[in-house]
Amino acid sequence: MAAESSLPPGDMEMSLSEHLRELRNRLIIVIAVTLLLMLAIFPFSAGLVDAVLAHAVPSYVKITTYAPMEMFKARLTMCFIGAITVGFPLLVYEAFRFAAPGLYPHEKRFLYLVFPFSLLLFVAGGLVAYFVTLPLFFSIVIGHGLEVAAPALSVGETFSIVTNFVAGLGLVFQVPLIIVLAIKMGLVKRETLVKGRLGVYGLLFGVAMFFSPDPTLFSQLIVLAVLAILFEVSMVLTRFL
């Protein structure tokens, strides 16, 4: 009886095989929908890749291919990103339906509160990367070589840089939420972070190096500046929470 009363409301004891079967069924749904969406997006993927690169890369830069499968891989990546974006509500729904029976009411409330903020921060980070960081990065890095040679970039490598920047900065923008949660959960004190700013900035620079491996160090400095601003915003928020 004690064991039953400790279960979350609405939860039913299931064997490992039943859990795995349910997980398999939900994964099949998500994978099938993702593949169908990729097939639907593929005819438009070349135009989407071109549109994505057109804003991020200066207009005087020539985008070309250096391998037979390069453009095809870029189109597949675009299809996958588009499918995940369009099918994201289904992904969230299936994940929540799988996990919900094992969650207590206060854990569900926590997810309802935190997840929207996390999603908004990720989108904000991606937008900053795409509309601010990437154009600035390409303009400065490519601009230094204009006197020597006309720039021609690989479509595959350039598209990979764009997607890595957008996804990486989206994840980096989770820093304020992580810091606020860590302080609220008592894992770290606000005063400790305030007094150890230099150490925190060093850690943030390490994160910037990881998410934007650029030999010029320019992109790392941009990401570090954004992270420093987010850290200070977090410190202000925790003062009132």
Curated annotation (Swiss-Prot):
The chain crosses the membrane at residues 27-47, 76-96, 122-142, 161-181, 193-213, 217-237. Pfam families: TatC (PF00902). PANTHER family: SEC-INDEPENDENT PROTEIN TRANSLOCASE PROTEIN TATC (PTHR30371), SEC-INDEPENDENT PROTEIN TRANSLOCASE PROTEIN TATC, CHLOROPLASTIC-RELATED (PTHR30371:SF0). GO terms for biological process: intracellular protein transmembrane transport; protein transport by the Tat complex. It is a multi-pass membrane protein. The keyword Disulfide bond does not apply. This is Sec-independent protein translocase protein TatC. Its main location: membrane. Disulfide bonds: none annotated. It comes from the Archaea. Forms a complex with TatA. It is found in: Cell membrane. Part of the twin-arginine translocation (Tat) system that transports large folded proteins containing a characteristic twin-arginine motif in their signal peptide across membranes. Belongs to the TatC family. InterPro entries: TatC (IPR002033). One of its GO terms (cellular component) is TAT protein transport complex. Keywords: Cell membrane, Membrane, Protein transport, Translocation, Transmembrane, Transmembrane helix, Transport. Signal peptide: none annotated. GO terms for molecular function: proton motive force dependent protein transmembrane transporter activity.
